Amino acid sequence: MARQLSVILVALTLTTALAENFPTRTSAPSDCPQADQGCWCHKNFAQCWSTYDDSRLTEEIGSRITRLELLYQPNEEVVTYIRRMSALREIRISEDGMSLDCSCDLVDAMDDKGITLVNQDELEIRNCRQQGWSRDTMTARPFLIECRRFRIQDDDRRKRRDAEQDSDDVTKRASPRKGDKPAGHKLKDLAPKDTHHLVSIDDVEKHPATDFFNFISGHRRTRRSTGTNEEVSDDSGRSARKKRYGNMNYPQPMNQPMGGGNYPGQPPQQNYAPQGMGGPVGGGGMGGAVGAGAMGGPVGGGGGGMGGPVGGANGIGESVEDEMSVDSDYSSLGGETTISAKVIQDIKNLLGATKIDLPVDINDPYYLGLLLRHLRHHSNLLANIGDPEVREQVLSAMQEEEEEEENDAANGVRENVLNNLNAPGQGGYGGTQGGMRGGAGGGMMGNQGMGGQGYNQGYMQG
């Protein structure tokens, strides 16, 4: 009898030693869950085969169990055990006929609590193709690696998306072209009235930024048409802006003809003359009584650029007057291109806040080009345009305007060089006898045409 008692005591001692640090079976009911509730202590693990609610694990027991083995539990119950047991550090998931789904929720729950899956090399995950995986069956180790990689990628995408949303505020980001400082002025600070992007509005008549943009783009010429490209729109019907690089040497065939002298008794002929020097002077037309030509003045024949009240109409004056008449048509094209004085004043006020000098006549297409250049070098004004689409349109218009100005400069230089190479001889002032007296028979060609002597005074031909 004594020997049997000794064996029982030794067995109890060995069982206690095998329990190590895990809560062992003792007389205290809180040390280990009871088997009749679906959990018990087994090989240093708390082994549970019921759901978390059915096992009736108290918070006190859950805060003491650090190693857990689950049997017959689907993914949802495994996640519940992990999240409810605060002291858990290791977990073993036994299949025992229960197949875990290929869902990364289980991996995310373990990573959030810092729990290790001790049997990840033996546990198999099946039916993964139904969840979009490339393989149908895999062990838990590669499954954990893939889920963690997916989570890192999702976090990176979320951070980039949040950063893009935070940086999309136009009032906070730096100038789109200079990139130095955020826009200093806001429209609401510039004008306490009702504002709409570029123009402040306190009247019944509205002038939004799109109208201002359409006004600018309506005066800008389209690309010049060529004989080989029919897709390029022709701007001959529209009023082109003034040339910044005028042809001050010899005119091209499209320039305004000056002078117009001819031999007596012959039909009138067109003689092109330098714009600034005056054309053939003297007897013209059909031989008038006092030598008045086709463009004759009060006394003499058709005067050139230097001809005064005696020599006839001034060539440059006619050319400038013609250009000004063309520019004045802008205010009546379609009835929508003229900006009212009030709106112009609003634009001046807005541009004045950004220290931009606005030209006096905004309806002049040449000054519109200056305004576009001002806008291009003052990006803060662009940042104040609230509508991204309108802001992009204005920026595109400025870029195209600058390209056309560069083309004008290149074309002007090239035309002047060609004119100097191919120019005829300079026309003189005409014979003094012919220019002043039609009856003397002078002033018929003025040594024009084949390179005669300039300023040849008083030669009378014929």
From Swiss-Prot:
Highest taxon listed in the record's lineage? Eukaryota
Record's signal peptide: 1-19
Region spans: Disordered:
155-194, 221-278
Question: Predominant location of this chain?
Answer: cytoplasm
Q: Which Pfam families match?
A: Bindin
* Chain residues in the propeptide: 20-244
| Entry keyword annotation includes Amino-acid biosynthesis | no
The record's Gene Ontology cellular component field reads: acrosomal lumen
Region (Fucose-binding domain) spans which residues?
372-380
Localization, per the record, is: Cytoplasmic vesicle, Secretory vesicle, Acrosome lumen
Keywords for this protein: Cell adhesion, Cleavage on pair of basic residues, Cytoplasmic vesicle, Fertilization, Signal
Keyword field contains Cytoplasm? no
What GO biological process term is on the record, naming one?
A: fusion of sperm to egg plasma membrane involved in single fertilization
Family from the record: Belongs to the bindin family.
Chain's role? Species-specific sea urchin sperm protein required for adhesion of sperm to the egg surface during fertilization. Bindin coats the acrosomal process after it is externalized by the acrosome reaction. It binds to sulfated, fucose-containing polysaccharides on the vitelline layer receptor proteoglycans which cover the egg plasma membrane.
Q: What is this protein called?
A: Bindin
